[in-house]
Amino acid sequence: MEEEPLLAGSINQGSGDYGAHSESCLHYPDEHTPRSRRLSYSVTDDSCNVEEDADADLYVQQAVVFIEDAIKYRSINHRVDSGSLRLYRWYYSNLCQWGLGLTIAVVLALAFIERPSSLTYTSDIRVKPKPWEPPCGMTEGIEIVCLCIFILDVTAKGYLIGWEEFRMNKWLLAYLIVITASVIDWMLSISMLCDENLRVRRLIRPFFLLQNSSLMKKTLKCIKRTLPEIASVILLLALHICLFTMIGMLIFAKSDDPKQNGEWQTYFRNLPKALSSLLVLLTTANNPDVMIPAYSLNRGYSIFFILFSVFGTYLLMNLMTAIIYNQFRGYLLMSVQTSIIRRRLGIRAAFEVLCCPGRGHTSTQAEGHVERVAVSMFLKVMERVHMKSYCRQAIVKAARRFPDGFISGEDFQRLFNELDKDFVKEHPPKPEYSSSGLQHIQYVYSHYYISVLGNAVALANVICICTVLVLNAEKSASEKNYFYMEIINCIFILYYLIEMLLKIVAFGWKGYLSYRNNIFDGFLTVLLLAIQIVIFITFKIPYVDVDPVPRHVMALWEMIRLVNMLIVFRFLRIIPEIKLMAVVASTIVDLVKNLRAFAGILLVVYYMFAVLGIWLFQGAISPPSNMSLVSNSSLENITGPYSMECGTFEQLEYWPNNFDDFASSLILLYNIMVVNNWHVFTDAYARYTTDWSLVYFVVWWLTSSVMWVNLFVALILENFTYKWDRSNGLSVEDVERIAYQSTVQLMFKEHVKEPTEEELLAQLHQHPHLHLSW
């Protein structure tokens, strides 16, 4: 994931006095020039030759930081003096960044224990006990510690980039405003003894997560630019719904015959009801319910609903998916372009600062500009760079191959192409045996068909379990005969154990563990064997003589059920053996690895809507005062907003779905995002509160189900298409290696325009703290 860039906005050429303190390498512009950078850093042949030894470590330190910036796609526009670079590296160290991430997680998790607390075993408002409420000052104390850490965070960022750049960075200014607002709201809470009804800071807490990720900010920017195209389709959808609403109200108008008023009474009674009915039909959540009253009178009425669904659900909604895919892919490509430029710029900056004369270099004397870097100096830098060990080894290995001992600018850039590649583990060689028997075992159990046989045995085991489950489906735990099931399990587990041991003999211990499939199989086999031994020791043999005490029977059944679940789970070993399934599994892994930013923004949206839902609807739905798990028929005589009609909130017993605490709010929002029966929630909250509550749910549906789900589908298509195209012509064993180049940047590499050397040098000239002159 890209880390937070210290400068995302434009660069002010007249920024203040931030730079290196080594006077031998300083470049002094005209002192009469307003806002000149008197301490800006420059590299010139004469000055660097004077105090070469004193400045050598600074140059190396600068190159190290610039390379680390390139690795993480960070901006290089920060201070470059020795003290600032040490602070900068400490700030972006794993310890500091993990600490900041933990702080963000803690401040977001406070919503689960703050009032209204989610610390109950159930969210069903009929039986929900009174939750534990933290004493006043407990969560506030944790929160103020987190806010102090955020203050230190924004202070460090402001110092490292300088005030001129800080005030032009909208994200950092917003960060400062959010911290200030949170502190003020926190002080109000303390002054009111935690008895306030509204905590504004809860709504803006997700900003801390958002601002800490460069990828999230880029994704949000892409979504913002895609909104106009999405809005045009939403407007067309609104026109489509309104048009069919008016036609529907004309077709299904109230008749003098009460028997023909079923459609009007239920779905087209008034304009808001008709609009909401067709909006829900657009998501197919109430299909064919909305059509049945009219369809039962005349089959011709079905044409109206079919036309509405065809044009709305299947044309316009899929058109929106296509637009989101097309537009967002373009903007994501622009974001990737920016990331590539940052990487190239950071690497070029490292090359330039290492080109100071006098430290193992060559230069073009006609121009006085250094063109090459000594390999020895480069290796010294690479020893101090924090990066993945396999990338470092690959880069160092490639650098040692230069015959003349020098690296040009183009070769310097090319060395770091290894950063885009994931590590592909090489399997260790098989052990050599002198015994013919062991050699025969090695030949047989290292063959591909042994894996096929193992998959067939696993399939047979699953089929046996399914057969037993079908035969015992109607039996209780005390009625089941566990003897035959355990005999079957023991036979298969014994085969799994023998297979594992012989594979270890064939591949060797290290070779066996070098395959992820073997690790998966071996772990489950050992676990199954351990559970089976526990069953033998605890319940003895035969199982038909198990003590009929229900407690013992249930304990045995639970352990056997655990064994069966592990055996079924072990059957997932077939996924890497089938090419299409391997590609799908690889796509899922890449989505988790590369698209975390999208999940992060979805978390932000969920968090904000959950807090807003608590504000608007907390306690809105409540069961009858004398209700305690009463039957459905007892509600029929109760007046008020309650309804026991078929398909209503009360009849379906959706009581656990509410906005009475943060955890239940998240679950309710998820249920609405899935859109199955989401009209049940909108109808209930409209009855218990007001019809305007529909606005909240429609906005959530548009945000989550329409925009975000379509966006996620589009990105899955892009990722899968990329993987599938690269997998054509590969064998099953090679599919796993597709992940060797699987970053988002490389997905769009062929469409990205590489920056030219002139463009990179021009941007380096605009660096606010590093003034390079040739």
Swiss-Prot record:
Write out the topological domains of type Extracellular: 114-140, 192-197, 254-267, 293-302, 476-486, 540-564, 618-658, 682-696
* Sugar-modified residues: 626, 632, 637
Q: Does the keyword Transmembrane helix apply?
A: yes
Query: Which region ranges are annotated with the description Interaction with phosphatidylinositol 3,5-bisphosphate?
Result: 217-221
Q: Which residues lie on this side of the membrane: Cytoplasmic?
A: 1-92, 162-170, 219-232, 324-452, 508-518, 586-596, 718-774
InterPro entries named among the record's database cross-references = Ion_trans_dom, TPC2, Volt_channel_dom_sf
This entry's Gene Ontology molecular function terms read: identical protein binding; intracellularly phosphatidylinositol-3,5-bisphosphate-gated monatomic cation channel activity; ligand-gated sodium channel activity; NAADP-sensitive calcium-release channel activity; phosphatidylinositol-3,5-bisphosphate binding; voltage-gated calcium channel activity
**Which segments sit in the membrane without spanning it?**
268-292, 659-681
One GO cellular-component annotation of the UniProt record comes to:
lysosome
Provide the protein's localization: Late endosome membrane; Lysosome membrane
Q: Where are the transmembrane segments?
A: 93-113, 141-161, 171-191, 198-218, 233-253, 303-323, 453-475, 487-507, 519-539, 565-585, 597-617, 697-717
User: Carries keyword tRNA processing?
Assistant: no
Q: Post-translational modification, briefly? A: N-glycosylated.
GO-annotated biological processes: calcium-mediated signaling; endocytosis involved in viral entry into host cell; regulation of myotome development; skeletal myofibril assembly; smooth muscle contraction; sodium ion transmembrane transport
**Predominant subcellular localization, coarse grouping:** membrane
Membrane topology qualifier: Multi-pass membrane protein
Q: Which family does it belong to?
A: Belongs to the calcium channel alpha-1 subunit (TC 1.A.1.11) family. Two pore calcium channel subfamily.
Q: What's the entry's take on its domains?
A: Each of the two internal repeats contains five hydrophobic transmembrane segments (S1, S2, S3, S5, S6) and one positively charged transmembrane segment (S4). S4 segments probably represent the voltage-sensor and are characterized by a series of positively charged amino acids at every third position.
Purpose = Intracellular channel initially characterized as a non-selective Ca(2+)-permeable channel activated by NAADP (nicotinic acid adenine dinucleotide phosphate), it is also a highly-selective Na(+) channel activated directly by PI(3,5)P2 (phosphatidylinositol 3,5-bisphosphate). Localizes to the lysosomal and late endosome membranes where it regulates organellar membrane excitability, membrane trafficking, and pH homeostasis.
What is the name attached to this protein's record? Two pore channel protein 2
Q: Which organism is it from?
A: Danio rerio (Zebrafish)
Ranked from the top, the taxonomy reads: Eukaryota, Metazoa, Chordata, Craniata, Vertebrata
